[in-house]
Amino acid sequence: MTSLRVRLSTAFVAVTVPAVVAAGTLVAPGIASAAPSAGCAPLYVVGVPGTGETSDTGSTDLSSGMLGSIVRPLASLAGSLTKDVAVPYDAGFGGAVKGGDMPYAQSVTQGETRLKTALTQIANRCDNTQFTLAGYSQGAQIVDKIAKQIGQGSGPISADKVAGVALLGNPARQAGSPTFPGSGTRPEALADSGSSAVNNIPPYQAPTPQGGGIGPTADSAGDYGQLEGRVGDFCAPGDLACDAPSNSPIVHVVTNLAGQSKLDQQDPVGTLASVATALGSTAIKAGVDVVNQDVSGDTL
């Protein structure tokens, strides 16, 4: 776990350092055209924690959890050039872990709404602030969705406000996706930043997992539009959250079933009823093709 955190921390800094350097040297028009408003910073890191790391009434402090462990090096590097905030939401996977009992799919929707609200509020208050978006696990799925909306021009802020996006263990990762979709092995700087710092970042050498995210296939569809090259989608090989076998639709069926259910260990009867309800709709969503492909012949 320690080595993984070190790699992710290094990767996260790689995504954000071009914006930090631009802010510090006052060469990025989008960042440095005017002094930041009171209480603002040239760069705002907005993080969405993973399952079990936050709750409906959780803290907005981004110093703990996986994201906290990788944001701290950036804060140490950049000092007053950055601020950060966590987006709390019901992250208990239907009650399976701490964080709430809202079914996973509903909590993802809640997280998306709260992330959009946070970005809108900060952008309205801080005219000259750039953003780095970061998400871990379930939080990465939330950030992935909003990043795609921003890149396609339908998000809460414009794409030129986003310095970088870091997705860690993303359940919405496309199968075989490179670490930096649209860019390859290193991120790209903002087109008008005037910074060449990104050219000094060594290529990211970790192997590219050939699987994809375990989340609903609809969530992995689409691209990042204008944010292509500024998104880092980091996945450790073998991590089922982001490297599930791409040729096994049944994996998505099981995830879809769990994602619609309340999984309260103290209420097995209620859990069973919730799973039964989800199973009814999941059977329709899955379709007979899944049964034909994955539950037939010698596979039983």
Predicted segments — roles?
Residues 1-34:
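Secretory targeting and sorting signals
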Residues 31-43:
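Low-complexity, acidic Ser/Thr/Pro-rich repeat tracts that form intrinsically disordered stalk/linker regions
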Residues 36, 47, 56-95, 110-121, ...:
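Surface cap/lid and interfacial helix-loop subdomains adjacent to catalytic sites
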Residues 41-42, 127-130:
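Short coil/turn segments at beta-strand junctions that form active-site/ligand-binding loops
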Residues 43-50:
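Short beta-strand element of the alpha/beta-hydrolase
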Residues 53-60, 100-107:
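Second-shell loop/turn segments in exported
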Residues 104-115, 139:
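Phosphate/oxyanion-binding active-site loops and adjacent basic polyanion-contact surfaces
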Residues 133-148:
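Gly/Ala-rich beta-loop-alpha elbow adjacent to hydrolase catalytic centers
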